[in-house]
Amino acid sequence: MINLNLVLFGAPGAGKGTQAKFIVDKYGIPQISTGDILRVAVANKTKLGLEAKKFMDAGQLVPDEIVNGLVAERLAEKDCEKGFIMDGFPRNVAQAKVLDEILTKLGKQIEKVIALNVPDKDIIERITGRRTSKVTGKIYHIKFNPPVDEKPEDLVQRADDTEEVVVKRLETYHNQTAPVLDYYKVQNKVTEIDGTKKLEDITQDIFKILG
């Protein structure tokens, strides 16, 4: 079996995190998210972590060169030898090129790019329908998983689950991601999957691709 060096793409609410967990559980490879890498580096007070902390404490975005350095360090770790899933990176073509350079130095390359395709209208319905109970903390969906024992006044919508915010996030995702997918399509690495199917069917589609 080839090394499972994967990039997983999907808009917010496409089910990317859920599918990544299934891949991790089945193949025993780590899920690599830039957010997690940053948190660990800051907690461990590494050189790059301390640099990143200055920007995070100031409420600023951590510059690409620091993030790229942290990604390079993470991919060189032993648990990535048999593969990994990149989650939330690369977000743009510049980062995709840097990722290729990092992997080339490690004698690796991205083997497969999986894109979960879900129409925007479905994403909006999935996210804007989410409600959280102020009492129990449980998360519901007004259509797909409606609450039975909760009072309506106890259910709240998160600020970033409003339609206005979701539409903006989708615009950003499409503007950034379309060129990255094109970058990998030229390399013949992209497989697109229908993300509107049943959860288990999507998982099986992914497993068939990975072998």
From Swiss-Prot:
A molecular function GO annotation: nucleoside diphosphate kinase activity
LID: annotated span: 129-161
Assigned GO CC terms: cytoplasm; cytosol
Pathway membership, UniProt: Purine metabolism; AMP biosynthesis via salvage pathway; AMP from ADP: step 1/1
Keyword line: ATP-binding, Cytoplasm, Kinase, Nucleotide biosynthesis, Nucleotide-binding, Transferase
InterPro entries per the UniProt record, alphabetical: Adenyl_kin_sub, Adenylat/UMP-CMP_kin, Adenylat_kinase_CS, P-loop_NTPase
Role noted for this protein: Catalyzes the reversible transfer of the terminal phosphate group between ATP and AMP. Plays an important role in cellular energy homeostasis and in adenine nucleotide metabolism.
Subunit structure, interactors included: Monomer.
Protein name as annotated: Adenylate kinase
Species name: Fusobacterium nucleatum subsp. nucleatum (strain ATCC 25586 / DSM 15643 / BCRC 10681 / CIP 101130 / JCM 8532 / KCTC 2640 / LMG 13131 / VPI 4355)
Taxonomy of the source species: Bacteria, Fusobacteriati, Fusobacteriota, Fusobacteriia, Fusobacteriales
